[in-house]
Amino acid sequence: MDSIINIFKILSGQSNNSNNLENSEKTSQDIAQKISDNVKQDNTDCQDENYVVPQLKRKSPERTIRSGEENTVHDSLNDRPAKKPKNDEKCQLFDKPIKVSVDDFTPTEKPSESNISDEKYKSLSREKSSSMVSFPVRKINSQIKYRPVERQKSSDRSRSSSRKRSRLPLRERSRSPSRERSRSPLRERYRSPLRERSRLHLREKLILRNDSLKKHKTDFVVSTKYDVHDKNKIIPETIRYNKKIYDYNPIDDTYYEVKYNGTKIWYKGNLVHRDELPAMICVDGTKKWYQYGQYERGNDLPSIESGNGRKIWYLDGKIGRIGDKPAVIEPDGEQRWYKDGKYHRDKGPAVITQDGTMMWYRNGKLHRDEMPAIVQPNIVYKWYENGLKHRDNDLPAIININGDLVWYRYDKIHRDNGPAIIRKTGVLSWYKHDEKIREEKVSLWEKNEYRYIDIIKNLYREFPYLIQWHYWNPTNSD
């Protein structure tokens, strides 16, 4: 009994499959007819507008169903609407190979029949994967929900053409031209010309220098060879020690040069030297005598005679003069005595200025035994010892003609007994080692223990010339 029921089910299933097959064939024929009508309508529209139809708008060829193939469709297809989405239509169209005919093209792009083939008009995706053309129809399972196929977009011809358009221009524009523009002009403009210019400049300098040295060397050698045996022969102009010289005497090796400021200097070898004549003559008229590189002139004559009248004597290369005579005489009459380049005079002031000021020096320092080392007439007297203001025996180191007295001990204001500063106005100041202790003012000199009149009388007795230089009333407190 069970076997009869199974046979009945098999027969009923075959009948259902046949019905489904007929329905699917009718549906596919209707879809193909609609697609062909749409393609023809698009072609007519494009021809009216004189527009060349792109490959995407070509008429899709009708597919032919091979005999022997089984199209298995699920029962749920009967429930779908008659108009199906484009994605499903494409999936069904590409399930089987497509035949192309001459009638499928417009008159402008109609090819010859001999050139029509399935392989020539295949898409790029089909060339890459040949399995898509002969892929068998898969069986649809009713229990699985399938998503609409959208991957066919990648096999569209528009993608392949866009890739070609996007990549090729980029390669041509960005790589090849940029390398040519960036590299070759830089090497030509900046590297090669700079190197050529710098090297040529250096070569020219070296060539000129070598030529000049050769010329000077040959001139000097020829002149010396020619003049060695002629003592009276003097070369008026030549080159020596890389400088231009004049009146060259090859026997004595004497010559002179002219500096950029016009000063003339005479040499003997490498030392400034000239016999009995100034070895240096400046533009302002100053004349200087040298002997083997140092100031020297015989017969007690000045070694420097300035253009303004100053005269300076040198002895053994240092400012000095034989005897008790001034080594420097200024044009205004000032006289200065030197010994071994320092202010010094054994008897008398070492400096006497135009106004009569006298200064005593010993070995470059202000010094005078028991007498003022600086005497400024009608002004002041100053006692110094080894360059320091100092006076012994409780006597003032500074005596001003106006009446002021100041006591110093080794250059510091100091007095053991009594005020260290006494002024004519009556102001008395006490100091110890340059520090002020107190100060007071007195009006009656006779009644004060420090009688100013007695001090002045003692000064007059010791320095009688104070009365002759200035007259003033010692009792006057003004």
From Swiss-Prot:
Domain of life where this protein originates: Viruses
Stretch list, region Disordered: 60-192
Compositionally biased residues, Basic and acidic residues: 60-102, 117-129, 147-159, 169-192
Recorded family membership: Belongs to the mimivirus L41 family.
Protein's UniProt name: Uncharacterized protein L41
Biological source species: Acanthamoeba polyphaga mimivirus (APMV)
